[in-house]
Amino acid sequence: MAAAVRSVKGLVAVITGGASGLGLSTAKRLVGQGATAVLLDVPNSEGETEAKKLGGNCIFAPANVTSEKEVQAALTLAKEKFGRIDVAVNCAGIAVAIKTYHEKKNQVHTLEDFQRVINVNLIGTFNVIRLVAGVMGQNEPDQGGQRGVIINTASVAAFEGQVGQAAYSASKGGIVGMTLPIARDLAPIGIRVVTIAPGLFATPLLTTLPDKVRNFLASQVPFPSRLGDPAEYAHLVQMVIENPFLNGEVIRLDGAIRMQP
């Protein structure tokens, strides 16, 4: 007999990078569907303001995902406030565009820049995964044995990295690579792990580009030939949460784009 689809209503979700972009859109959707959201983002973000806009079912938990102490404090705050954590959505990340070697400038990619991207995107994601798994593991399992769901954000750059994306592609490729082994690690305690690899989305990073550039990027998407809407990412997050058999998978959400150099 198939397991019943689980509603997001009543669930508690921690969302990193929750003050803007994909993270904020996810928080809005989940709260709108009756869930509670904890916006985990850096202290100088708009997290406090955005949480207040979303009402009593949302709070801001300031933390840098690279800090064990800060993330643990944020998770403790969430559990003390709401009693448990059912879902974690990892959206926090940064990007740089630096060539490995720039011939005209006679300039090499600095290790500091490479390490910074890896530290936030890859290590930061794993830091949240490992700590939130410890909290979810204390939940009472549902009828299907599930205690929690962890959803990570990679990128199509994990598969078709562009010029200047060595660090970014490495960080997102790492997230893709650790999805299955972590899903297997956490399977015995009933925690699912899924990664979404978005294509070109209308996030703050892209909306600041000139119209000409954005229109060109949108034209590269086969269908629909436009930038993705963050609400579409949030919709997929909800679908992942609600489908109990979806585990250990990386899902491309990209309008069938396959980036060329």
Curated annotation (Swiss-Prot):
E.C. designation(s): 1.1.1.35, 1.1.1.62, 1.1.1.239, 1.1.1.178
Molecular-function annotations in GO: 17-beta-hydroxysteroid dehydrogenase (NAD+) activity; 3-hydroxy-2-methylbutyryl-CoA dehydrogenase activity; 3-hydroxyacyl-CoA dehydrogenase activity; acetoacetyl-CoA reductase activity; amyloid-beta binding; androstan-3-alpha,17-beta-diol dehydrogenase (NAD+) activity; chenodeoxycholate 7-alpha-dehydrogenase (NAD+) activity; cholate 7-alpha-dehydrogenase (NAD+) activity
Enzyme class: oxidoreductase
Residues modified as N6-acetyllysine: K53, K69, K99, K105, K212
SUPFAM superfamilies: NAD(P)-binding Rossmann-fold domains
Domain of life: Eukaryota
Reactions it catalyzes: a (3S)-3-hydroxyacyl-CoA + NAD(+) = a 3-oxoacyl-CoA + NADH + H(+); (2S,3S)-3-hydroxy-2-methylbutanoyl-CoA + NAD(+) = 2-methyl-3-oxobutanoyl-CoA + NADH + H(+); testosterone + NAD(+) = androst-4-ene-3,17-dione + NADH + H(+); 5alpha-androstane-3alpha,17beta-diol + NAD(+) = 17beta-hydroxy-5alpha-androstan-3-one + NADH + H(+)
Cellular-component GO terms for this entry: endoplasmic reticulum; mitochondrial nucleoid; mitochondrial ribonuclease P complex; mitochondrion; tRNA methyltransferase complex
Catalytic residues identified in the record: Y168
Residue positions, PTM N6-succinyllysine: K53, K212
Residues annotated for NAD(+) binding in this entry: S20, L22, D41, V65, C91, Y168, K172, F201, T203
Binding site for substrate: S155
Family matches, as CDD domains: HSD10-like_SDR_c
Assembly: Homotetramer. Component of mitochondrial ribonuclease P, a complex composed of TRMT10C/MRPP1, HSD17B10/MRPP2 and PRORP/MRPP3. Interacts with TRMT10C/MRPP1; forming the MRPP1-MRPP2 subcomplex of the mitochondrial ribonuclease P complex.
Function: Mitochondrial dehydrogenase involved in pathways of fatty acid, branched-chain amino acid and steroid metabolism. Acts as (S)-3-hydroxyacyl-CoA dehydrogenase in mitochondrial fatty acid beta-oxidation, a major degradation pathway of fatty acids. Catalyzes the third step in the beta-oxidation cycle, namely the reversible conversion of (S)-3-hydroxyacyl-CoA to 3-ketoacyl-CoA. Preferentially accepts straight medium- and short-chain acyl-CoA substrates with highest efficiency for (3S)-hydroxybutanoyl-CoA.
Name of the molecule in the record: 3-hydroxyacyl-CoA dehydrogenase type-2
Gene that produces this protein: Hsd17b10
